Swiss-Prot record:
Active-site annotation: S135
EC number: 5.4.2.2
Annotated keywords: Carbohydrate metabolism, Glucose metabolism, Isomerase, Magnesium, Metal-binding, Phosphoprotein
A biological-process GO annotation: purine ribonucleoside salvage
Lineage: Bacteria, Bacillati, Bacillota, Bacilli, Bacillales
Record protein name field: Phosphoglucomutase
InterPro entries attached to this UniProt entry: A-D-PHexomutase_a/b/a-I, A-D-PHexomutase_a/b/a-I/II/III, A-D-PHexomutase_a/b/a-II, A-D-PHexomutase_a/b/a-III, A-D-PHexomutase_C, A-D-PHexomutase_C_sf, A-D-PHexomutase_CS, Alpha-D-phosphohexomutase_SF
Amino acids binding Mg(2+): S135, D289, D291, D293
Its biological purpose: Catalyzes the interconversion between glucose-6-phosphate and alpha-glucose-1-phosphate. This is the first step in the biosynthesis of diglucosyl-diacylglycerol (Glc2-DAG), i.e. a glycolipid found in the membrane, which is also used as a membrane anchor for lipoteichoic acid (LTA).
Cofactor(s) in the UniProt record: Mg(2+)
Pathway in which the depicted protein is active: Glycolipid metabolism; diglucosyl-diacylglycerol biosynthesis
Amino acid sequence: MKALWLENINESLVKDFYETQTEEEQNAGFEGVLSFGTAGIRSTFGLGPARLNAFTVRKVALGLAQYLNHNVDDASVVIHFDTRFLSKAFSQEMASVLANNGITAIISDNYKSTPELSFAVRHLQVNAGIMITASHNPKNYNGIKIYNEKGGQLLPEASEQLSEYINSIETPLNIEKGDFNAFVENGKIKYMSNEVTESYKKEVKSLVGSIDAHDAKVILTSLHGTSLPLVSDILTELDYHNFVIEKEQSEPNGNFPTVAIANPEDEAAFTLGKQLADKTDAQLIIATDPDADRLGFIERYGDNDFRYFNGNEIGLLLMKLRFQDLTEDSTPQYMIKSIVTSELAERLATSLNVEVNDVLTGFKFISDLIEHKQKDDDKQLLLAFEESHGYLAQPISRDKDAIQMVPLLVKYKNLLDKNGITFKETIEDIYENIGYFKDRTLAPTFEGKAGVKKIESIMSQFRNEQVFSICGMDVLKIEDYHVGEVRDMITGHTEKLTLPKTNLIRFIFENGFIALRPSGTEPKIKLYFSLEVENIDEITQQFEANYINNIV
């Protein structure tokens, strides 16, 4: 098989990557096949069925074409791509395969963000959307996310159906794609008009309203991704000009030269921003990840001190400040959060008389619930968020949307600044009045086949053993979403969980929870801690050492 792939290497788009890889890395591309998971496909570049290249991308496109042609007539699809290596080329490969199978592909001629893709699907009323991105993964990764006609990522049932079509294609080397330029000429491939972007901007500006105070200077960085110049254009059109772009870090570049990892969850990504803040006397640094679905920020205050806010804290701030922003609107509000989001979010929502809705991890579940909630005209969304720095205030899109959140944060920062208040003081006020939960997320990595077995062993051991105490804390309940049951560890009584089944276990204590699940896109196990304790770091270290690393 490898020889046949090598014969076609010039058409693979990844020849240069392959030739710089070690023999072990090259061989890994022929061990198994890429699987379309709950978050689509994400992988490193390389030759072979287990890596991203022109042929495996065509395979996904053909599977999607077969899936759509089976379910709808005259299907159409929007395709966007980010600033990563080969993103544009992959988008054209997919468009050609779709067009060759009778599906109209609407593509962008320049990089776009994930929230723009979600909005475009809804705005253009197409049957599906494709986003070529690996979000905040390292530079040697890329990926494909598929969206349904509502603009949300595919739910498990649809994802499984699509996966069956993709997996049924045995020889991706033989997939016909037709001529891209010919399809453009005959209209099967169309370039998206600027009207879509303008409509999206209009919706975002409507959400923000106006930015009346302008004294707080803000630094923006796209981490070499897609949020600029769109965000700066929106701010300018809102007549807010007191921002500075970190130019070196905002050049579109899939090599991500100024950061080790282009992830606003990583405080190290703000190094250049902090240096620029020192020079410009800016009070806030906002960073978005490469496909602009996630954001993070650091506040500069006092005598040149900096405060980094984690994903839960940003969500809490947005909840409180947006609630205050909507005080003149008497419409009942609801919020949505994932089950691994801070316990403090529910307490804050309850104190604000806001309805709380829990969903599984993955913004697709938030999107699906919003779709149902939107049919209820009596309630409006306050905020939907996950602890992993993903937020949505106005459901103009159906995925995490950093583009709409940046100008909202700028507005709130200036309103606070006008009253001599900082984000730091605001979050401390929440802790003082609502409770001081400390939240941490760890993601130990276990590479290769041995890593897969290790992660399976960890989940199996926690699932099959009776656990009454963890790190000195009594376990009150164990929620096992894989079997769909919650067990009361005091009475032994079990009940059915109401949320869909997924590979996640959550241990409930009197003072919070610890949860764990395998990552859907990387060889990692995600560990979530939300506890009302002082020694959170001691607990996380003890848990990882005694309950994760010791399991064989």
